[in-house]
Amino acid sequence: METLIRKRPYIFILTLLLILMPAGCAQKAHVPEGFVYVKEVIPSAELDIRYYGSNNFTGRPVAGYRAPTAILSLQAARALANVSKDLESQGYAIKIFDAYRPQKAVNDFITWTKGADDSRIKSKFYPNIDKKDLFMAGYLASKSGHSRGSTVDLTLMDKKKGQELDMGSHFDYLDPVSAHGSPMITAHQTANRELLKTTMEKYGFKSYSREWWHYTLTNEPYPDRYFDFDVDE
């Protein structure tokens, strides 16, 4: 009995810790092994996770986005940290629009293409193409590299001004003007895109020809796996 009484304070403390720990460690509970939250690796990264809200080409929140956070494979996050460090030394910061994307979100895109157009959304994100043709044009796919966990959509910000660099088109503007090498943008806008591209390539990422914001780690750790866990905290 005396031993039990002595142990009670410790039992109470242990119980209290078990109650409080989920509040402090909930973030890690939702990330599978091999994945990390980008902000844990790159605290200076700005996040603007578009598919969590309605400011995207669907005009609504997308399935699987339960929090406005960014997740990547550990390898991709570390490589992106090198990108960020390099750019910060030049007065720039990275702003992330999307990173890991669950397969359920990709499926939601497919469902969306079968519905009616919203003229307001269409004019902002895909004015010169029908949504049913977005797959054929290479803007959407039934399997996305984002679901493998090593692809990121991002832009650059001027740290001093706190503004995005002018890239000639905005994120998710599904149009030829968003392609690398587009002749429809100015020399200054081309230089901004090239700064992002050369720095990303320097640290092991490859670009996607149709979208200036889209990069994938060349030596990605899960080249044949497509994940479906939610983007959550």
Q: Where are the language model's segments positioned?
A:
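Bacterial N-terminal signal peptides that target proteins for export
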Residues: 2-12
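Short, low-complexity intrinsically disordered segments
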Residues: 6, 210-211
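Intrinsically disordered, low-complexity segments enriched in polar/charged small residues
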Residues: 12-13, 219
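Bacterial N-terminal signal peptides
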Residues: 13-22
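Extracytoplasmic cell-surface/polysaccharide-interacting catalytic and binding patches
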Residues: 25-99, 104-107, 111-210, 219-233
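Conserved metal-phosphate-binding beta-hairpin within the catalytic cores
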Residues: 215
